[in-house]
Amino acid sequence: MRFSIEYIDWELSPCDPAYDFVGKDLPTANEELTTVPVIRVFGLNEEAETVCCFIHNVFPYIYVEYSSFAETLDLEVPDFLSQLQTSINYALALAARANPETYKPAVQSVQLVKGIPFYGYSFCFQKFLKICLFSPKNRDRLVDLFRQGAILNKVIQVYESHLPYLLQFMVDHNLYGCAPIDLDDSIIKRDDLLSFCNVEVHVSPNAILNACWLSERNIHTDLYETHASSPNSLLVTSLAEIWKSEASRRNLTSSDETNSFSKLHQSQFGLKEESSHEPRSSQHWKNEVAMKDLLKNLIKSKLESSSDVNTPLIFDPWPELPTIYSAIHTKDYVRPSQNDISVSQISVDEKICTSYESLPKIQLEQNTAPVIESSFEQLDSELERILGDTLFDSFPYVEPNVDRSKFPKSPLNSSQEVTIHSSQDRQSPPSSPLKDVPSQINPFSPSLRLKGGSPITKREIEFCRDLPNRPTSSEPNQGDTRKAGKRLKYSRNLDDYHICTQIPEDYSPKFLSQHESFVYKQQPPSTDDLYGTMKKLKIPFSIPTNVHYSSEKDIPSYSQEYLGKSHYPIGVSSRYLPEFQSDGSVSEKVRLNPLKLSNFHGERTWQYIKPAPLAVDLSNLESKEAVSEEIQSPQRLSRSKVFRKDPYSCVRILALELFCCSHGGLTPDPTKDSIECCFWAYQEDVNSSMIDRVGFIVVDKSASNSSFGRSFPSCTVLVVNSELELINEVIGLNRQLDPTIVCGYEVHNSSWGYLIERASYRFNYDLPEQLSRLKCTSKANFAKKENAWKYTTTSSINIVGRHVLNIWRILRGEVNLLNYSLENVVLNIFKKQTPYYNQADKVHLWQSSRFHEKQILLNYMLNRTRYCLEILSACAIVTKIREQARIIGIDFMSVISRGSQFKVESIMFRIAKPENYIFPSPSAKQVAEQNALEALPLVMEPKSDLYNNPVVVLDFQSLYPSIIIAYNLCYSTCLGPVKIVNGKVKLGFMFHSSNPNIVNLIKNDVYISPNGYAYVKENVRKSLLAKMLEELIETRNMVKRGMKDCDSDYVNKVLNSRQLALKLIANVTYGYTSASFSGRMPCSEIADTIVETGREILSYSLEYINTLDFCHAKVVYGDTDSLFVELPGATKEQAFDIGQQLANNITSRFPSPIRLKFEKIYFPCFLLAKKRYVGFKFESVSQKAPIFEAKGIETVRRDGTPVQQQLLRRCLEILFKTKDLSTVKKEFQNVCYQIMSGNVPVMDFCFSKEVRLEKYKELSTAPPGAVMARRLMTKDPRREPQYGERVPYLIIAAAPGTTLANRSVAPEEFLSSSFSQLDINYYINNSLIPPLDRFLNLLGASAQSWYHEMPKPRTSLKLTETVKGGIQKKTLDTFLMEKLCSSCLKNNIEIIPDKINSLCSDCLKNPCATISKAVTQHNAYNKKLSLLFDICRGCSKLSSSDPVLCKSNSCKVYYDRAKTENYAKVQAEMLTKTLGSLDW
């Protein structure tokens, strides 16, 4: 039986003798044995049926050091194990404040095993006690008791307690999330099913066949450890599956599955870019000699003080004991008798146990992960090894052992043809005027080895060099005797010279004496000669344009000093040009012998050497090409990219949205507002972009299914009579469709969260239990804010058997947006607008008597529900999560809810378990007490300036992972410091001591890091971290190479998801060692070694580049793993050549796989400060148009406004293209003018910053967005923003001294109030000018001065709209409007007794012109408003009679419409006043 692991959790259930085997000497079932853990796995089989599997007899366990207390007890091992077991039960009973005599047993078994400590180099096995428990809940409690010394009065170090129960199970049995689990025939099916799944089984862990793919690697049998795995094998099973899948896709399959992997593996190694003929050297550190001396002295002193110098080395003192790996799969749990130990004999610290309840609780971790070894043979595949899939794409597909005569001959673009023969089936070379020249190529240096350390075999490759113009058919063409020549010929049409001659390449003209001609005695210099002279004289090849002013009036009359540098403004007129330096002398030779030019004239033309083809020739050529394509089609078919789709990837997903009818336009409240309609969308396969079914359930007593069905023929419509029926129908729909994933755009305050809260409050209904896949469960719940971590990171809704996705929160990690509303996400992903209706408008549509308006609401909600699934599909969110779960080995939900350390451990444990390594589990106190991190990466402070010369960006690829691999760094290879301080050797959170005899034997195979720590080299013990990272990096390179020739969107999504998962794990491995606050197994010394080594590598590279003379390169900035190198006077083409040369030279100076990659050039660019730069990016020589790229500045930051981003980017682009400050000034002043004139959309002024209301102690210290949200919540409590939600707000003008928080308003508040005005001065002076001035000040210019000197537009006053009750807002504008003429807005009104007048005397004298003006303005605004309404109706797919209710904050048309609507109302009031004043 086989099915995928889509969902996994556990629960405690009563012991059932039919399934559970708890061990020997336990009370019988009649005595009510304690509950036992049962793991529940939900998945899909190949027939897409849902499967529920209950796995019994899997118990959580921890390890403790046997040597910590065993030697102090005068007991035999069985007796000691019994006493320890009884002591643990007694201590747990006291900690639980229960009676020890009646407390149910908590320990399932205690077993003595052996393993290799992972934390620090250890060469021999040590004893450990494996303690299995009945409940995972007791594990953390027991760990605390051990650490406090409450058991046997001994403080004991605990091992592997930080590995959660489910992850422990998945690692032990080689299981991976979203990957198949294989079961044997020993499965049990019962009649009374516990779930709603199609298939339900009960199994024991022995039935899981995945564990059979693992095998123990006995590598700890010698001082110089052997590698038990095959050279081509992978230690992580999930990575081996990726290689097999890619081999199948590239058609490298064979009858033997392992051969397919081997072919691809050898192909990948042949394509490794760091392969070279010469071995790469290892750079010596500055303090290396001193460190080696310290190590020698340390060994000498320890040997002198040691008494067991001649003690023989024993690597396995207890061969009879099971290893930790073999103990995992022991079927019979050996349980010592506990009848002989009385309670009075137990040594337990009761004070510690009874006070346990006062200790801080440690949250249980319930997650999982996986890894495996596969062994493969090495095949002979020279073609794929050398060529891969990307070279010689224009050639017919060639493979080893294929008859070359089957392929048609065709002319080559190149003058050479490469033919590669397999070493086993090399045919005799064809007859050719040139002989085959064998050439041995070794693409691997001695330092580059495959898995296991075996060197890669050399192969012979034969190259056949044919003639340049070889025949184009299979038979030799004897009639073609043309020689190679130029494509064009040159002739002169003279009276006596009409012959056109073909010029061979080696032709040199020899003029006869009777012809009058001039030949230079000295040939002109070639381009190479000129370049050489320029290099010698240090003349720049390119002189960049300096920053200047194109307009004389813009040039300031003074110089500006900034950062200690004086800037003198320059223009483009002649007075700014440097004077020409010359003494006016003329060469004597030129003066006496002037050059005489020939009076020889003639007409010159160019003619093609070969005439144009005739139509007949073209038709013959087409027929030949057609035949050629028919011949090549089988080969092309064999090269087609076939990707076998995962049969378990068809995960079903259900999206749900609700409409609730609230009062007063408030956000729906589940305690008050009933659910009127439920909308759903269903997708059978998340990999498909098609939505299979949509529908809705509506509460309407007066309507029927047919009335709604006629309007929505493509939807599944169901009309119910009550809200309770609606909830029951949702439950029925959920069970019928049986989705693995349920989702909503926001699932806490709406969607599933609202549905659950409403059912609980109104009907006292436990909806999560009904929605689960189990008939009865206690783990389904909606804790909301009780589980703070899930509430703020994923979803706090727990439905057993199904995953709940909170889409908007997942999108925060996928796309960088200023606002994560559904409308803005759709706009940025699909590039189209979607309407937004507020709650009041939705209620209005629902309560309308017109069914058509109800239909508008239903269509609106259905579209929003569809978008939930379309967004998931477009961003490939589910595919990314599933691929990451399959690679890392954790369950689906842990991918988005757990941190990087949890994911690293999943892979580390999978490699460590078969090698019998055992990991310590530090307490929070131990982590805090380890040595502080000392090393810092090298981050230079750049010289802030504009760099007009090309700046080459060099980046060390995966520097920290490469350092770990190159220098064999790991916990298990660290010997400790070479210098001991205070006689103590502390490694991370533990004290570590190395055997001086062992260190003395391997002293020549030790690497000493720059921070003074010693590590054994690879030939002694291969670093486990290096093993893991090698496989991750090699697999990612292979996947990325496969993406280049992938033409399927689905396959590209899968491959991209895989390489992202691999990249994530490789990049966070260093962080796992350096997590000094929340670390699960940190080691500050190893982290310092990695950082210090990286610092030394970057420092050496910096010094090497700065000392070069041939290119005058200068490092202007460096950051951790990258270098910015300025090349003065170089052209763009030269910059690419020099950059590649620098990268190759530096790469050769460090051991593999450390590689410096030439990434790009910036030309030109600004360097502002650390991690803040911007420039025009070029990634290839052929790239014509530059790409604007910025890091750390306002154009990419999200704490500003869109208008700020747009202005800064526009000015920088102009500056980079023209170097003209006058043009930049004009653009800046134009934008400021448009802003002050009110021509910039209001949405471009919105700030959108994250709000976390629970984090602010006082409202007075909260940011403006939080203050505004609090103010809105006083009116609408359910409008509370989600944790981390970006809340948009505007800054309006107010009285001087008003705080920014009190001037912040929501966009809808601003638009609904015609008297509010944006604080334009704040936006210009505080938002636009400062970021721009940071660049302009470097050039001697100032945007602040440009703004002060520009003319400011006068804004005309607009009559403010009256509010209810006729009361107007008494702003300065309204006061002036009361005194000014409503028509001309210039003169004061004419006061007429006993009459209300709003016109001045001039306008009263000319009533026709006054009325005409008022009517014209009124009609103009109405016409514009009508046009905007038509645009909105078209976007919302409404008819001309439908109301436009859209209020999308992501649409510029909405802001324009709202502004025009306000102006239209103002003009209507002005027209009414004007007509009233004229008695109309």
UniProtKB/Swiss-Prot annotation:
Q: What is its EC number?
A: 2.7.7.7
Question: What cofactor is needed?
Answer: [4Fe-4S] cluster
Return the PROSITE patterns for the record.
DNA_POLYMERASE_B
Comp. bias (Polar residues):
411-427, 470-479
**Which CDD domains does the UniProt record give?**
DNA_polB_zeta_exo, POLBc_zeta
- Residues the record lists as binding Zn(2+): C1381, C1384, C1400, C1403
The segments labelled Disordered in the record are 403-488
What are the coiled-coil residue ranges? none
Which locations, inside or outside the cell, does it occupy? Mitochondrion; Nucleus
Keywords on this record? 4Fe-4S, DNA damage, DNA repair, DNA replication, DNA-binding, DNA-directed DNA polymerase, Iron, Iron-sulfur, Metal-binding, Mitochondrion, Nucleotidyltransferase, Nucleus, Transferase, Zinc, Zinc-finger
Where is [4Fe-4S] cluster annotated to bind? C1432, C1435, C1446, C1451
User: What InterPro entries does the entry give?
Assistant: DNA-dir_DNA_pol_B (IPR006172), DNA-dir_DNA_pol_B_CS (IPR017964), DNA-dir_DNA_pol_B_exonuc (IPR006133), DNA-dir_DNA_pol_B_multi_dom (IPR006134), DNA/RNA_pol_sf (IPR043502), DNA_pol_B_thumb (IPR042087), DNA_pol_palm_dom_sf (IPR023211), DPOD/Z_N (IPR056435)
Protein function: Nonessential DNA polymerase. Required for DNA damage induced mutagenesis. Involved in DNA repair, mitochondrial DNA repair and translesion synthesis. Has a role in the bypass of abasic (AP) sites.
According to UniProt, the name of this protein is DNA polymerase zeta catalytic subunit
